Amino acid sequence: MKEAYIVSGLRSPVGKAKKGGLRFVRPDDLAATIIKKLVKNVEGLEGKMVDDLIVGNAVPEAEQGMQMARYISLLSLPKEVPGFVINRYCGSGLEAIHLACAKINSGSADCVIAGGTESMSMVPMTGYKSALNYNISQNNPEYYLNMGLTAEKLALEYDIKREESDLFSLESHQKAVKAIENKVFDQEIHPIDVEEITVVDGKRKSNK
């Protein structure tokens, strides 16, 4: 079995749904920007060496639909490089990396780019039209349990207090802020250039 190695990793900054700086950036453009920079960062790597592109996405519709991975490939790599989308909800990006590893282990690929992209500004959490299975809805509605209710059930089952959750969240954010201030993430976060055009009194104004 061939060994698989992660030789480089890169990501965009994290945005804020509906009102963050990346709210108007398409997820395919976001991923393409990162991939182009990633390929440049790896010494000796050329786009044509990539055997496959695997993209994780939890809601593959609208701006994230139409086999998005293929279009990301066309935007960032030679047209000969294929791509496909994998959906395992919140674990989609990680599953993409697992599949890349499996392809290399099996000998069906030598070089794979894998990760995930998502815009919760452009595509809502449950998509634009949920069409749930009637039999499941009637007989096993818990199969469609959302993450919020899942959290409530876990809190009850494992006796997790609200204060404990809030403290964990606070400490997590504090660690992230400290890491950013100490430039710990500088090598893995690639900045995204964003331009917004607004019209005020008939005059166009550009904000970058």
PLM feature spans:
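Active-site-proximal alpha-helical scaffold in enzymes
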Residues: 69, 88-117, 155-185
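Conserved catalytic cysteine-centered active-site region
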Residues: 57-110, 142-152
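Acidic, glycine-rich active-site loops and adjacent beta-strand->loop/helix elements
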Residues: 10-13, 56-60, 88-92, 116-121
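Short, well-ordered amphipathic alpha-helical segments that serve as non-catalytic structural scaffolds
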Residues: 27-42, 68-72, 96, 147-154, ...
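Flexible glycine-/small-residue-enriched beta->alpha junction loops
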Residues: 106-158
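Condensing-enzyme catalytic core mediating Claisen C-C bond formation in acyl metabolism
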Residues: 1-27
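N-terminal extracellular/periplasmic Venus flytrap/periplasmic-binding protein-like
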Residues: 11-13, 24, 28-33, 44, ...
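N-terminal beta-alpha supersecondary unit
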Residues: 18-41, 49-62
